[in-house]
A protein has these predicted regions:
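Charge-dense, helix-prone N-terminal extensions
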Residues: 2-152
């Protein structure tokens, strides 16, 4: 979901890290089936070792499904909204490299997060690459190695 400024006025968080535990987001249920291209990305991520996938709930209504969450253990990898927008929870170095290479936009409401849309078939490969980079980062791969995968 592409955030609207008015929607997020009270949680403007660009100067802090957002660390949200899966259990704080609402009832833990299997992820929903998404539209065609976002679903292809979701299915790929769910195959990866130690990934926890669950329903992503609406920020303001914990009974309204809003997409699919992905965690590596207790660390958030990112989530895909029902409309195909992805919010990816990266760190400073990785987000800067992603933004520099124009692979995503800066998520305006959380430091070091990036966002992008999965709207067409060509977006699937890029989305999987970005989720994979973040997955590898959370698994301890050195930042220089990750950045070299972007600068191919």
């Amino acid at each position: 979901m592409r955030p609207q400024a008015a929607t997020f006025d009270y949680i403007y968080l660009t100067d802090i890290e957002i660390i949200m535990r899966l259990e704080d987001k609402g009832q833990i249920l299997p992820p929903p089936v998404l539209n065609k291209y976002p679903q292809m990305v979701s299915e790929e991520i769910q195959k990866w070792s130690n990934i926890i996938s669950a329903t992503h709930w609406d920020l303001y209504d914990r009974t309204k499904v809003d997409g699919a969450d992905f965690y590596l253990g207790k660390k958030e990898l990112g989530h895909i909204h029902l409309d195909g927008w992805v919010h990816l929870a990266t760190n400073k170095e990785l987000s800067q490299a992603i933004l520099k290479n124009k692979l995503a936009e800066k998520f305006p409401y959380a430091q070091n997060w990036v966002m992008f849309s999965i709207a067409k078939k060509q977006d699937v490969k890029k989305a999987i690459l970005l989720f994979q980079l973040n997955y590898d980062r959370l698994n301890g791969e050195p930042i220089d190695t990750l950045i070299s995968k972007i600068n191919i």
